[in-house]
Design a protein with these regions (language model features):
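Short, ligand-facing micro-motifs at secondary-structure edges
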Residues: 14-17, 34-66, 83-85, 94-100, ...
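A structural connector/turn signal
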Residues: 102, 223, 228-229, 258, ...
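Non-catalytic DNA-recognition/assembly elements of restriction-modification systems
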Residues: 1-29, 114-130, 141-187, 315, ...
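Extended Lys/Arg-rich polyanion-binding regions
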Residues: 74
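A short glycine-rich beta-alpha junction/loop motif
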Residues: 2, 66-71, 103-123, 260-269, ...
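Sequence-specific dsDNA recognition surfaces
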Residues: 4-44, 61-62, 66-69, 174-193, ...
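Ligand-binding loop in jelly-roll beta-barrel domains
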Residues: 78-82, 273-278
Length: 340
């Protein structure tokens, strides 16, 4: 069957005439709730899909709502198609295949109505929905657990070191340059070395976040045997910081990553610290605290395209607590990460 056989598409409309912050009905765009309204277009159990912009982010809405003019409402014919079954189909369908522009991603009603969908008997649909609902519930619980663990670590940082902006423990303050043994940026133009069966990894900015380095979606690479590769190959305990785009994302190289063999790209800088004074994990969390983020914002070298140079990195200032305390915090982080 096609979408045209089993659902209707409700066009969104401009919300200006109905918008009211105290309105009864939510206003949905392709990214989620944008406000509230006094009227609605779509009934409960409708799937929202972007007409422009975010076209691959279906949303299931279980209450009446107003959809804006950049979002479609997919209304299932409930006698043959369960709304939640339609939602899960949309979650797994790549709407980018129907994109009609090369600039802002866009979908047309005509193209959507031609999508083919397998529609089994209602009892089979219900069984599929029940299984997927349970899976999504478990995923949501896990995500909440991970969030709570991250909040626990951030709270522990404040407990141990105090607010880094006010420095209540009067720890000495120094520039990062005083404790750097090695500093370099990553390689550019290495696309030719990126291969699916590569024996090592190429770390990009997407892998570096929240003081960790994720090996998920790591780019395999066969690095060249030259000075450039030797310079950009990471070692255990190296601190990585993003220096373009989303400034100040940090991660610490683990033994697993170092043993596998990994290199950084041009959007990252690699810092090898004097570990007799600074624990890299402590520095990572300090730099991702408000005290660190404010420095990255103030040192941004461009109003158009975010960027940091080596002088900016060297001049970053931080509190230097006793190393024993830093190590205790790093051990707490490691123990918490085992629960993830």
């Amino acid at each position: 069957m096609r979408f045209s056989d089993v659902l209707d598409i409700r066009n969104g409309r401009n919300q200006r005439q109905v918008e009211n912050e105290n309105g009864k009905y939510p206003i949905y765009g392709s990214g989620g709730v944008m406000g509230h309204a006094d009227d609605f277009i779509c009934d409960a159990e409708t799937v929202v899909i972007g007409r422009k912009g975010s076209i691959n982010n279906p949303i299931f809405v279980d209450e009446p709502f107003w959809n804006v003019d950049t979002a479609f409402g997919l209304v299932a014919h409930k006698e043959v198609l369960l709304p939640k079954y339609l939602y899960y189909f949309c979650v797994n369908f790549d709407f980018e295949r129907l994109n009609t522009t090369v600039t802002i991603p866009s979908l047309t009603k005509a193209n959507l109505l031609q999508i083919e969908i397998r529609v089994p008997d209602m009892d089979i649909q219900q069984n599929i929905v029940s299984v997927l609902d349970k899976i999504c519930y478990l995923i949501e619980l896990r995500q909440k657990e991970l969030y709570n663990l991250d909040q626990l670590v951030k709270s522990r940082f404040i407990e141990m070191f105090g607010n880094p902006k006010s420095n209540p423990n009067s720890y000495p303050i120094s520039q990062l340059s005083e404790h750097i043994k090695f500093l370099t940026s990553g390689s550019r133009g290495w696309a030719q070395y990126c291969v699916d069966n590569g024996s090592e990894w190429f770390i990009t900015i997407k892998n570096v976040k929240d003081c960790r380095i994720s090996i998920d979606n790591m780019q395999p690479i066969n690095a060249p045997d030259n000075a450039e590769a030797k310079r950009t190959k990471v070692q255990e305990g190296d601190l990585l910081i993003s220096i373009t785009a989303d400034l100040g994302r940090t991660g610490v190289v683990t033994k697993e990553i170092a043993d596998h063999g990994a290199y950084i790209n041009q959007h990252l800088t690699c810092i090898r610290l004097n570990k007799e004074i600074l624990n890299p994990m402590y520095v990572a969390f300090f730099m991702e605290s408000p005290a660190g983020k404010e420095q990255f914002e103030s040192k941004n070298q461009s109003a158009v395209k975010a960027g940091l140079n080596f002088n900016s990195i060297n001049s970053l200032r931080l509190l230097v607590p006793p190393l024993e305390l830093q190590n205790q915090f790093a051990a707490f982080v490691a123990q918490t990460d085992k629960s993830k």
